[in-house]
Amino acid sequence: MPLSYQHFRKLLLLDDGTEAGPLEEELPRLADADLHRRVAEDLNLGNLNVSIPWTHKVGNFTGLYSSTVPIFNPEWQTPSFPKIHLQEDIINRCQQFVGPLTVNEKRRLKLIMPARFYPTHTKYLPLDKGIKPYYPDQVVNHYFQTRHYLHTLWKAGILYKRETTRSASFCGSPYSWEQELQHGRLVIKTSQRHGDESFCSQSSGILSRSSVGPCIRSQLKQSRLGLQPRQGRLASSQPSRSGSIRAKAHPSTRRYFGVEPSGSGHIDHSVNNSSSCLHQSAVRKAAYSHLSTSKRQSSSGHAVEFHCLPPNSAGSQSQGSVSSCWWLQFRNSKPCSEYCLSHLVNLREDWGPCDEHGEHHIRIPRTPARVTGGVFLVDKNPHNTAESRLVVDFSQFSRGISRVSWPKFAVPNLQSLTNLLSSNLSWLSLDVSAAFYHIPLHPAAMPHLLIGSSGLSRYVARLSSNSRINNNQYGTMQNLHDSCSRQLYVSLMLLYKTYGWKLHLYSHPIVLGFRKIPMGVGLSPFLLAQFTSAICSVVRRAFPHCLAFSYMDDVVLGAKSVQHRESLYTAVTNFLLSLGIHLNPNKTKRWGYSLNFMGYIIGSWGTLPQDHIVQKIKHCFRKLPVNRPIDWKVCQRIVGLLGFAAPFTQCGYPALMPLYACIQAKQAFTFSPTYKAFLSKQYMNLYPVARQRPGLCQVFADATPTGWGLAIGHQRMRGTFVAPLPIHTAELLAACFARSRSGAKLIGTDNSVVLSRKYTSFPWLLGCTANWILRGTSFVYVPSALNPADDPSRGRLGLSRPLLRLPFQPTTGRTSLYAVSPSVPSHLPVRVHFASPLHVAWRPP
């Protein structure tokens, strides 16, 4: 190691022709402030203020000023989502599989059954902001593709659909916490003179279109009379369990959401038995206003269910409802031009329902007809531009007044990963389909995670310059044709080929809430990490001779032989499927003995970055300009890439410290040819990070500000510094001397900074050199009172403390992998016992 030191001096142009002396003399000089100033001038590192214009692009790296323009693909396919339903009794199923669970495993699984999200503040945005105008040239295409994506998610049971202020519907299998509206249900039966049996007999939608008015009015009268004694303060403080409705007869301006507003004016909830109220839009509005009123005013703990709903209420529209539907109004209107939407609407007789309802209706907390985040579509990933991915912007929960501090969770660092996974096992990785959408969310979180759209008419009206949105006129015949245009007509005709009758369905407004955890919230990665780590922990204990490990949705399995790995794969796959976890068998990758994981290649020899990252680094250096100031935001991107591979270089992170300093000062950075050559040489030769081995520590180092001491076996050494040094610097130098003189890869020290192996806070040149010398060295903490090198460092060689026998055990970080399992009783009486093909149980190295 010390031989490389001269090379280091030459590289940084520090040699002035004189031969370098011994390490004990030369190394302390690297902490000298004067030398650092001289080097900074030579390498042009200290010149932060520059007058030349900054460079904002280096290769593919750009600053925030010139972000890449997103490309819309009209041919995007909406990915299909399996009917994901994680089993509610997941803890019991795991216990049947492996016996009693550890406290850690239980705690993690309870966290996600169901997940909860309660921010302190939630900002509600108008529905117009539901779908972001991310592609200004493809507004209509983007609108329908996004609506189709949302519809697909709803059909797959990933979203709730807001039906009224206090009820929602969804598809798929319900969980026990999703309170189906049965206990406080309202099955409205009317007297025979109205000719109606009940709401259940109606075919289209929640309420019948034709005979709603009188039925509701008589019901309102009954429920109002029935609840009279309980009104007032008592009623609000002691909710009744009867399930009847405490509905005050007050005019409500709320409307059922999902139906276009009409210009028919205000509906009075007067209580009478008149059956003459047959104007359809008024009837619909009365019906839905009654619904939201009953929810809002219900004194029971539950809301109302019309429980004879067909799963998809997709009947043909009754004639009367046309007046309230923007889309169907075109049918009876005179075409305004050859590009009038009435030509499209008249193409088919049956446009299907204005609205669809889920298989189950549940009670939810009060949810406004608003959104809390916008959505837009992008390519699924850089390698798959054929499929789209939905981006949900819930950034309000990461900034400002509604900021939520997300829980921290342990991410395995490089050394822990290497200690754990660098072995002679044969590996495969599993692909979990839509991993985030496995974890159910409590319905109480729905009002905080709302997405949706205001409907095509309003969306187009907002974006077109010639239309006026006026609450009184909106939806009336006068401005119906304001949205007609050649561009809209052509777009809709093309989309009609793709979506058919669904164009009508998608043109209506909708509000959706998340039923499974969304990707755009900081809580989701935490929950996913807890979930997969708990499952892998169970798998590891069920198969102690194998290894299962996960980070987020990336799950890897390792076994001693290929045959054993395949049988493990079958058993684990069956177990995961029984829990309701969906795997994508086509994307299962068999890696052999070199595992590709988290951007690394991990083999028995250690860990290296994957090839595509190495190629990116080479490309970055090819494009890196010299003597030109580079925007600090671009420097952030460069440091992100180089920082990932820094542990594999000789000088490590300290080599990047000048770049870090410029980013912190928010100043441009100018690469000098020498500094670029130095970095380039560092990154062209990458060295693997090796697995740490357990062992006994027999080499100890200690220092005081004025001197250093070593204990190598029974040998003691000491030395003094030319000038007093800061204690951390002195301790680091002592550790370097111990490594250099003994060659030991295990050194005992009492300094926490040296133990941390983070040398970025030391003088730059010293940090680089120390990283070079101490690369691959493990440290053991020894208290000062017991440190055999303590006396030599204070100049006392005569006294000899007994040499400690300090064992070193490599750490696997906070991944809680090998907690000792509780004693497991014989939980499977008919279990088949067979000898493992390995004969010996594998333990972590």
From Swiss-Prot:
GO MF term list: DNA binding; DNA-directed DNA polymerase activity; metal ion binding; RNA-directed DNA polymerase activity; RNA-DNA hybrid ribonuclease activity
Activity regulation (UniProt): Activated by host HSP70 and HSP40 in vitro to be able to bind the epsilon loop of the pgRNA. Because deletion of the RNase H region renders the protein partly chaperone-independent, the chaperones may be needed indirectly to relieve occlusion of the RNA-binding site by this domain. Inhibited by several reverse-transcriptase inhibitors: Lamivudine, Adefovir and Entecavir.
Report residue spans for region: RnaseH domain (RH): 693-845
Outline the segment boundaries, as ranges, of region: Spacer.
180-348
Q: Give all residue intervals belonging to the Reverse transcriptase domain.
A: 359-602
Lyase in keyword set = no
Gene3D superfamilies linked to this entry: 3.30.70.270
Q: Where is this site: Priming of reverse-transcription by covalently linking the first nucleotide of the (-)DNA?
A: 65
- What is the protein name given in its UniProt record? Protein P
